[in-house]
Swiss-Prot record:
Its main location: secreted. Keywords: Acetylcholine receptor inhibiting toxin, Amidation, Disulfide bond, Ion channel impairing toxin, Neurotoxin, Postsynaptic neurotoxin, Secreted, Signal, Sulfation, Toxin. Residues 1-21 form the signal peptide. The modification Cysteine amide is found at residue 60. This is Alpha-conotoxin-like PnMGMR-02. Disulfide bonds join 46-52, 47-60. GO terms for cellular component: extracellular region; host cell postsynaptic membrane. PROSITE patterns: ALPHA_CONOTOXIN. Residues 48-50 are annotated as: Ser-Xaa-Pro motif, crucial for potent interaction with nAChR.
Length: 61
């Protein structure tokens, strides 16, 4: 393989790695935010109070 071809393959690998890393990072951001909200509501005791639990059914189940 020539140097130009090896360099092109290297650039493609770097680009593919960057794209996969970027999209997987963005996908996990939503999960992290939801977990943080659930922890905050639980710590504050929201789920034990009926009005709060009714306004947050996604978190209090």
């Amino acid at each position: 393989m020539g140097m130009r071809m090896m360099f092109t393959v290297f650039l493609l690998v770097v680009l593919a790695t960057t794209v996969v890393s970027f999209t997987s990072d963005r996908a996990s951001d939503g999960g992290n935010a939801a977990a943080s909200d659930l922890i905050a509501l639980t710590i504050k005791g929201c789920c034990s109070r009926p009005p709060c639990a009714l306004s947050n059914p996604d978190y209090c189940g």
